[in-house]
Amino acid sequence: MRCVVYSIAKSSPLELVKIYQKQCKRFDCELELVDLFPKNTANAQKVSKELAQKSYSLAFEPYLNLKAKNIALHPKAQRGDSFAFSKMLENHLNINFFIAGAYGFEENFLKDCQAWSLSEMTFSHEVAKIVLCEQIYRALSIIFKHPYHK
């Protein structure tokens, strides 16, 4: 299995994420994080919400894979517990997660993904990545009946 988390963010070292990446390998899952922040995104965010959202879509589009499960994290989307999250991931070999910038996703981009919400609360990119990586590991623990999830 391969899970890739794409986000509109400047890169930052996250030690906890590295721990979850290592733990996911136990389940033969490569957990990869890719931070994207093209120059046009920085400029677009200064101009308008619509332009910013378009720049996020343009940054993410090369990574949308029709053969993979594409999941966009969106605050107004479906949410559920860790068991529901694990069911969503089960039986997929390639999963791409997308975390938009401050202005969120364009509606057109969301049409190409399944939308999922981690919470009603707003998180920084760093916190969202940590929560997502932990939930991916927890989902794998549920799927493979590992005692991490009790």
Curated annotation (Swiss-Prot):
Substrates-to-products reaction catalysed: pseudouridine(1915) in 23S rRNA + S-adenosyl-L-methionine = N(3)-methylpseudouridine(1915) in 23S rRNA + S-adenosyl-L-homocysteine + H(+)
Binding site for S-adenosyl-L-methionine: A100, L118, S119, E120, M121, T122, F123
One Pfam family cited in the UniProt record for this chain: SPOUT_MTase
Alphabetical keyword list: Cytoplasm, Methyltransferase, rRNA processing, S-adenosyl-L-methionine, Transferase
Gene3D superfamilies xrefs: 3.40.1280.10
GO CC terms: cytoplasm
Residue ranges crossing the lipid bilayer per the database entry: none
Subcellular location: Cytoplasm
InterPro entries: Alpha/beta_knot_MTases (IPR029028), RlmH-like (IPR003742), tRNA_m1G_MTases_N (IPR029026)
Signal peptide start-end: none
EC number: 2.1.1.177
GO molecular function: rRNA (pseudouridine-N3-)-methyltransferase activity
Family, similarity comment: Belongs to the RNA methyltransferase RlmH family.
PANTHER family noted in UniProt: METHYLTRANSFERASE, RIBOSOMAL RNA LARGE SUBUNIT METHYLTRANSFERASE H
Function of the molecule: Specifically methylates the pseudouridine at position 1915 (m3Psi1915) in 23S rRNA.
Record's subunit section: Homodimer.
HAMAP family according to UniProt: 23SrRNA_methyltr_H
Name of the protein: Ribosomal RNA large subunit methyltransferase H
Organism taxonomic ancestry: Bacteria, Pseudomonadati, Campylobacterota, Epsilonproteobacteria, Campylobacterales
